[in-house]
Amino acid sequence: MEIDILSLFPDYFASPLQATILGRAIKQGALSVRSRDIREFGLGKWKQVDDSPYNGEGMLLMAEPVVQAIRSIRRKKSKVIYLSPQGQLLSAKKSRELASCSHLVLLCGHYEGIDERALTAEVDEEISIGDYVLTNGCAAALVLVDALARFIPGVLGNQESAEYDSLENGLLEGPQYTRPRVFEGESVPEVLLCGDHQKIADWRKQVSLERTRERRPDLYLQYFYGNSACLSTQEDLPRIEVVSPKTFSVVLEVQDLRKAKKFYSRMFGKECWDGDKLFLLGKTSLYLQQTKETRGPTTVFIELETDHDFVRFLKRWEMLGGELGEQGTGGFPLRQVFDLDGHIWVVSCVQK
């Protein structure tokens, strides 16, 4: 695999690419990484690459030097990636996908960013390594190279290790142990010494689930959502219990009463209805009111009893034609969803 990195600081990459596993992979020919200076394509006598933006402060990389730099190395099957906090969040899945590319061009951002016209003309995808801003994109480019290199055959001494690392299967990796068998009174778990590979695999899976649930509940719920069995009929699903210590009533304006009632009947159960009034729990109720023009979306907040209810709710909502919105941040099980009329439901799960 070949990777070209475009930045204003090509020497930034020298040490990391000469040492550690990446350096060994490059020496062995499993990976080729080159860094080029965008200033080589600067304008005029002074090789200008930046200028002040029309609508803000600071400086921007100009479109022409960036476009020329990309086109000088781009090939027919190249994929150009811009490292940006606005891009798709880098994941193990995305790293594996990029590792299958024959040639990547990584564009590093500098200053306040890059002229949008250069991105529109040449960039295939934007990728972020996290919800924070760096002084430049060089560190992000190194993170991306390191993450995807692990999936290139020949880079790791033992390719199987990449398959068991944290996040590769959507879960955090469980605890690991080496000699001695007992350290400061704490022993290695007996199951790891039994020699039964199936028991060891089952144990690893269980502790991986427990650790993910404890430390990254967002990943835990995402894992169950993605791996839950395909549901053929809504009648096969048990009722989802809504937690509501307080009494409240909500009126939802809908354009098609029959269609909306069918949607919510399948979501919460036909037995919950009394005319056009839906009882979510106890005295908590939802009224549907048909109108030609709605006054805008209503926001409904509900809390579910268990993680599995949370996952089932999202799966059922999507299957019935509802739209899934943004996932909550900070690892808290929270999701915004939209019904058929655009009303907003903020769904969360009881924290135990």
UniProtKB/Swiss-Prot annotation:
Record-level GO cellular component terms: cytosol
Coiled-coil region(s): none
Entry binding sites for S-adenosyl-L-methionine: G109, I129, G130, D131, Y132, V133, L134
Domain of life the protein comes from: Bacteria
Family statement: Belongs to the RNA methyltransferase TrmD family.
NCBIfam families assigned: PRK00026.1, trmD
Record protein name field: tRNA (guanine-N(1)-)-methyltransferase
Species annotation: Chlamydia trachomatis serovar A (strain ATCC VR-571B / DSM 19440 / HAR-13)
Gene: trmD
